[in-house]
């Protein structure tokens, strides 16, 4: 019997985010046809990952190869760039062992062609400066330009350049929205880009509209780029206009300076804001389905899997007009360009039952694009494009010979 094609799938650190959901579902998509190995620098708690991502993977469905990263560094908040450098160097050392290579979260320079599933834009300094807000608690953002420069110079040195150009058109870059694909093509005109929306595994059916609370949810990591403080300010202004709405903030309060500030802000408005903390699975779905509306704050987020979850739950999510989240809702009435515009559009929807009904149908149709079946079929198709390449075997032989 012929041996199965081997694939090395890299993800530096599996936490609780959209990149993890996409990576776990990629393994789910590939495990029956490929011999899959996950290359990571962090721990793998499969029970927790299945619970968070909605997958049903078992021990034995894939192998795990861990990069030799010290335990203290694996758990250190804010050391993403350093962990990534050590992880990427390890991936390049292992590259020759696999027929096909893929990165589940942002580009990984394996020194040969690969499929690059890109979850955000924070890995590129130019794009990070445009679309990301920095937290003063991150190691990569310590005070002082010289300190930051020295830190990132160290990380680049540890990565060890391979001479391979990921953006010249040999690698397949998989963007999670048409918006992000356009950003990548503008930044790297020679790159080869495919668009594949991430999966949303939502098991609960939406409640009837009349049974939902006239309130809002805000879902996701409590991080500066998510702009949870802006969401609170928007809804505070909506309340000032006479609408007695409330807010549930769902996301892990991890003790970072930003999350501490958000906790204080929520406590100061405890009469209408409830902090739910980290929620997953049915616990999260119960809160989402019980509410009519949602607000998302990150302008320039490539996709926004939290927004897709809220849409699947039957919410009407208000999102920034810049970024992939606007593709999820598909309605200009739900997309805002600044806080004032958000307040105006929220109030218009709150005042009109007819508009709510019209938008609900549009969002419902749009949410159908984000099923796990659509995603897994797309993963198999895109990985197959690389695996079927006549030069894929030569790439592996070249990597082994280095």
Task: Go through the PLM ranges and name each one.
Residues 251, 259-279:
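Nucleotide-activated donor-binding/catalytic signature segment of Leloir-type glycosyltransferases, i.e.
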Residues 174, 206-226, 232-235, 248:
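Conserved donor-binding/catalytic core segment of Leloir-type glycosyltransferases
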Residues 137-173, 181-182, 186:
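Membrane-proximal helix-turn-helix segments that form the acceptor-binding/catalytic region
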Residues 299:
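Aromatic "clamp/platform" in nucleotide-sugar-dependent glycosyltransferases that forms part
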Residues 21-25, 223-237, 257-260:
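A conserved mid-protein helix/loop that constitutes part of the nucleotide-sugar donor-binding site
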Residues 353-400:
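A charged, aromatic-enriched C-terminal amphipathic alpha-helix characteristic of glycosyltransferases
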Residues 315-319:
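Short hydrophobic beta-strand element within catalytic cores of glycosyltransferases
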